[in-house]
């Protein structure tokens, strides 16, 4: 299993989630977050915004669905401009459903 954390523009979340659903990636957690990338925020004239609002999508997928989920996020979240976001992937050793106690997804 793989955990995918995608930090995307807030305005792209609906499109990204709809595209993921079409690809069969339905289960996810969505959080509103603030952060900055290499550009250290946005600088417009004399005004600086050090942290920008983003949306973080968190999902755990089976190994065979990882590449499809990443491709879907990249294609649906990309504008080609700075601030499109990042995707982080980490292995998940175990997962359990709290209600049933059963392991796995």
From Swiss-Prot:
Q: What does this protein do?
A: Could be involved in the regulation of nitrogen fixation.
Q: Which Gene3D superfamilies match?
A: 3.30.70.120
Give one GO biological process term. regulation of nitrogen utilization
User: GO CC annotations?
Assistant: cytosol
Annotated protein name in UniProt: Nitrogen fixation nifHD1 region GlnB-like protein 1
Q: Which residues form a coiled coil?
A: none
Gene Ontology MF terms:
ATP binding; enzyme regulator activity
Q: Does the keyword Amino-acid biosynthesis apply?
A: no
Known PANTHER family for this protein?
Answer: NITROGEN REGULATORY PROTEIN P-II (PTHR30115), PII-LIKE PROTEIN GLNBI (PTHR30115:SF13)
Family matches, as InterPro entries: N-reg_PII, N-reg_PII-like_a/b, N-reg_PII/ATP_PRibTrfase_C, N-reg_PII_CS
Pfam families of this UniProt entry? P-II
Q: Please report which protein family the annotation says this sequence is part of.
A: Belongs to the P(II) protein family.
The alphabetical list of record keywords is: Nitrogen fixation, Transcription, Transcription regulation
């Amino acid at each position: 299993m793989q955990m995918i954390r995608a930090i995307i523009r807030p305005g792209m979340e609906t499109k990204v989630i709809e595209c993921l659903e079409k690809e069969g990636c339905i289960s996810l957690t969505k959080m509103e977050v603030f952060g900055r990338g290499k550009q250290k925020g946005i600088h417009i004239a004399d005004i600086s915004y050090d942290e920008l609002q983003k949306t973080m999508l968190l999902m755990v997928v089976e190994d065979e669905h990882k590449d499809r989920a990443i491709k879907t996020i990249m294609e649906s979240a990309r504008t080609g401009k700075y601030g499109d976001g990042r995707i982080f992937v980490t292995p998940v050793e175990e997962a359990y459903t709290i209600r049933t106690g059963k392991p796995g997804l």
